């Protein structure tokens, strides 16, 4: 599913191509591009869920904390998000790319991927997609885009 999401993001969203394509035509295009039908459906559902996070009712249920609060992960989240990825999320909060609200959106979207092994690169793409979809996060999106395309980003302790 991650391949489909990255393809859609790079082809339509990131390249400023207008995405006024009917879902059926988009599905056909993705299938012709060689993606599996199940991955296509899951990716489109994932994008719909991401778009729903912009709704005020959905925002209300996302917990926000103060700048000194610490995120405690559930066991399911620990199982789905490895230590390196959790550390990267903390790093993004510390450098103000993510807020507690956008962090929660990222975690929710990562868990919706239903993947056994989330790579750091996949996490970076999810963060980028979330930030792209949240109004007022243009600066954070730009910073994340730089982090995504810079391979020598390291966490220093």
From Swiss-Prot:
Source organism superkingdom: Bacteria
Chain's gene name: smg
Record-stated family: Belongs to the Smg family.
Native organism: Aliivibrio fischeri (strain MJ11)
Protein name in UniProt: Protein Smg homolog
Cited Pfam families: DUF494
